[in-house]
Design a protein with these regions (language model features):
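Catalytic machinery of carbohydrate-active enzymes
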Residues: 1-218
Length: 218
């Protein structure tokens, strides 16, 4: 009988948690181990917990103790497979089988978003004052215009979140309109329905890669 897995992400963001989303199922299937979230896990907002762990049937509950899975210091010298989700599976002693993070919510399809690109140039951890950890805004603007030219037939909609998701650094570009997002689940639905998303290397990008399981053309 192998010990239970006590999993936790050091940071509470969406991408921070999604990067471990394939582990509980694989621990169960490959090693017959139950996975619990470490007591005291913090989440930037409750919806991150709801989507990533609350709906994950392989999470058995919350457990006190020290975590033995997640972004632990001993896992920094990672083996490389060329894919970061597989890397996490590998360092946790699992056969690496997943290339994308996983959500267990079945997203809806909105026909009226066909032919549309979502634009979410917001990020919580990346700041855009051309300082160190961030993006050169002129470069962002240029890249966005290139994408618009390349997909001239598509309609581009700026994503606006109804609920508080955290202190957001947002870079505004000209789009054709707005798509209001009422919840993280509604965001999954929209990503499942759109032709593409323009975003930074942020939680939205990680979520989009999970939704590619349902919408491979995203």
């Amino acid at each position: 009988q192998m010990n239970d897995v006590i999993l936790g992400a050091y940071h509470g963001g969406l991408g921070d948690n999604l990067q471990f989303s394939t582990l509980p199922e694989e621990f169960y299937k490959q090693q017959g181990r139950e996975t619990y979230l470490v007591d005291g896990s913090n989440f930037r907002n409750k919806e991150i917990y709801d989507l990533v762990w609350g709906m994950n049937p392989y999470i058995k509950g919350i457990k006190e103790g020290s975590r033995n899975a997640g972004d632990l210091p001993e896992y920094t010298d990672k083996k490389r497979t060329g894919n970061w989700i597989k890397d996490w599976e590998l360092v946790h002693g699992l056969e690496p089988v997943n290339e994308r993070p996983k959500v267990y919510y079945e997203p809806k399809k909105f026909d009226d978003l066909a032919g549309h690109f979502l634009v979410d140039l917001s990020s919580i951890t990346i700041n855009h004052h051309n300082t160190g950890y961030g993006y050169d805004l002129k470069e962002v603007e240029r890249t966005f215009q290139n994408i618009r030219t390349r997909f001239a037939k598509n309609i581009f909609l700026s994503v606006e979140f109804d609920n508080y998701v955290g202190e957001i650094n947002k870079f505004n570009v000209n789009t054709d309109g707005v798509s209001k997002v009422s919840s993280i689940f509604n965001y999954c639905d929209q990503l499942n329905s759109a032709d593409g998303i323009v975003c930074f290397y942020s939680g939205s990008m990680v979520l989009a890669t999970a939704i590619q399981r349902f919408n491979p053309n995203l």
